[in-house]
Amino acid sequence: MTNFVRGHLIPLRVRREGARCYNPAVNKDQVRAAVAGYQKQRITGETLVQSAVLVPLLCKEDELHVLLTERTLNVGFHKGQVCFPGGTTHPDDDSLLATALREAWEETAVRPEDVEVIGEIDDNVVRSTGYVITPFVGFIPYPYRFRASELETRDIFFVPLRVLMDPLRFYHQERVIGGHYYSGPVCDYDGHVIWGATGRILEHLVGLLTGVAKTPSH
């Protein structure tokens, strides 16, 4: 059996993954080393709306990828943009992590119990909406029965970390994207444009990973 997500056939046969998932950019042990002990920068403010996202990492074709989504045109903000699974807090959420895991389930059908949460990285503020985003980094299984939310998620796709860690592929640009002037980190990948808060969060993660990637992991 397979699951189809806009051009991706996802086999449902589960393969046992090794702890390392080696690739030329970085492996699982190095990701844990970079993120698990990181002392994050938290941003607070009375006028900011609390939100959280999951930064899902998975081992696909023997290298680490990050899962991203493309929003539908039916959502209230950031229509058609690339983002992580996530959203604003609900009264029933007992923590920001609960928010990130709930939203990941709603948008991609990744179950909370299937996420190995590694840690948090720096908060990020979206000035246009007044959101402050708390990113949680975690490993998820692959293959997996992903399911895109009809209301919120137009596409689910995967970007190799080696692409994001390549300064010729992911770098600061000044350009008009979606009718908006933007200056910041951008990556064009497989017809998708990764920018904005998503780009800034990935830029921060890449910065953490670049240091540990230079250190051999045993």
Task: Describe the function of each predicted region.
Residues 3-4, 9-12, 21-83, 88-144, ...:
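N-terminal leader/linker segments that precede catalytic domains of diphosphate-processing enzymes
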